[in-house]
């Protein structure tokens, strides 16, 4: 739909068909949107092609899901009653998802719009997003630390509540790492660079697994007795290191080479208009989910543990391909939406016109 002109050797010229169906191009230049050429054509493995981007995104999402399963196994070896405590990390990130579904989801109609803005301006929006998300994530982390007792009373069973306070306070700063990671990941996907989110996930999971094997696994080095708080510290360290590494990799390989715009208040306002809609939707959706979770937790530790295991399986088996398809599709729809908005035709568009054609004119 929005192929990379450098990678594919073609120039996107005429975009969607006019409302009256007159394309103005010869039939051999026509590229039907319902054709699979945009997904499996030349260089299908490339990150600027839908199939290639989908593979990158699938790998990026599946690695954290795999690690979440391993964590539960290792914690069960330490103390099976504390497996439910590891779900605190999930619930903190669920609350953080509210801010991660705000401005970061606005990238698909702003940063992904290749027609309305230059690459320099799109990079400036990405920088504004990253700065604002980092500030919001830091604020949310401080709130979690201050309200650790109240958080435990809502999302941790009574039997292990006292033993989970430190775990909550350590895991609180995962809201900051999550905010940075999501901002970088969404912005780079909108810029047709899904390899950067994959780099972040690969680095995070690889270091996490290596340190967990060395420190908290059943065959760890040393003579100490590992506990759940050590695991929380390892996970937080790796999350922060991966998020910051991905940020600096993006800045040094893309932003500095392109002399991109600096973060601005105007960039924040551009993102705020579409982002406020997704923010409200996410707040309502996640509030209902957390209300359901608190009800399950209040029933018993067994129910809470079972719910956590079910959620881990669900995110691993079902939601990974769904998230990968969503992120990839939103990127390419954002590109096409930018093309669509540049059409000079003011009348209302019919459904047939919206399912129009794209034209590729060889160089």
Question: What are the residue ranges of the model-derived segments?
Answer:
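Alpha-helical transmembrane segments of multi-pass membrane proteins
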Residues: 146, 158-184, 363
